[in-house]
From Swiss-Prot:
Region spans: Disordered: 40-78, 274-295
InterPro entries per record: KH_dom, KH_dom_type_1, KH_dom_type_1_sf, Rnc1_KH-I_3
Main location: cytoplasm
Cellular compartments annotated: Cytoplasm
Alphabetically ordered keywords of this record: Cytoplasm, Phosphoprotein, Repeat, RNA-binding
Record PTM text: Phosphorylated by pmk1. Phosphorylation causes enhancement of the RNA-binding activity.
Name of the featured protein: RNA-binding protein rnc1
Annotated TM spans: none
Biased composition (Polar residues): 57-76
Species in which this protein is naturally found: Schizosaccharomyces pombe (strain 972 / ATCC 24843)
A single GO cellular-component term on record: cytoplasm
A Gene Ontology biological process term: negative regulation of p38MAPK cascade
Residues with PTM Phosphothreonine: 50
Amino acid sequence: MAYNHFSIPKNIEEKENSFFDVTFQDEPDETTSTATGIAKVSIPTPKPSTPLSTLTNGSTIQQSMTNQPEPTSQVPPISAKPPMDDATYATQQLTLRALLSTREAGIIIGKAGKNVAELRSTTNVKAGVTKAVPNVHDRVLTISGPLENVVRAYRFIIDIFAKNSTNPDGTPSDANTPRKLRLLIAHSLMGSIIGRNGLRIKLIQDKCSCRMIASKDMLPQSTERTVEIHGTVDNLHAAIWEIGKCLIDDWERGAGTVFYNPVSRLTQPLPSLASTASPQQVSPPAAPSTTSGEAIPENFVSYGAQVFPATQMPFLQQPKVTQNISIPADMVGCIIGRGGSKISEIRRTSGSKISIAKEPHDETGERMFTITGTHEENEKALFLLYQQLEMEKDRRSH
């Protein structure tokens, strides 16, 4: 069995992997572009404090999925990985996403795609912006490549913003004008940036002379949160480098990230957990389509981790995959339901086997849920678990 271990946040609802092929129109806001690269960091062995990818015999995620051992009640120990110097960090692959306004997206794309084309050729990265959607003001920028190039690309973007903005008094802005950048960070990776007791984020702020604000809540129907960086062009440039290093150090934690898609909340309503729909009716929303109408492959997840897509040929037996996920102690009851009714419904609807640890697995008090099934079955189970958590969170907030 392949083991993926990550903590479930409290308002997750669907998985989006939004990369779009580049198609340029005359109007920037109607332009579509995409980064088809995916960040993948080659690291000898994961660090012991990172429970995200639970591997056996030092195998990679892909290897462990083809050589599947039986699940155990204990998470196998993993060894520490050596530290990297800046030269090594610079070459590590990373995908870094940012949240943009429609106006900012238009500036980055430029007339007939001129700016984004220059961005790619100048910094040697894969870059794309999600397409504009009526009545939706958010768009997502995705940049993939070696860390050094990704940082240069964001510097290029910040410089473009500086050239196309003015100060409150109407004078042109310059490199010393304070500005803001909103990065999208997986909830499971936010701790790598904040650090214990906020120590790491404070260190980054002091080192880069910037101000950083990490959002408490995840964006709708995703497991991504925002980190706002406030400062001058140089401040933002330095902060992005430090944040990139944090993400590379703990890239395994990003597996299973549900990407924020500004379109999803308008076009993909969620079914009710209490409905009597068949498994086909409650399956997670399909991957977004490119402008050519072809579905984006589902085997892309953030920050380098990859999983195998469910086969499209039902007559072939799909491999069973095991995922270990942690549920906050105070939310376990709402998942199980009275007499186990809710967890039984999730098992029946998804087709996955779901077992629950009787005791917390660490000092956080979280309980381990083990989900075993095909990739498609597990996706359905996770979707329903996330939805139940969101419903419970909404109920408690009223």
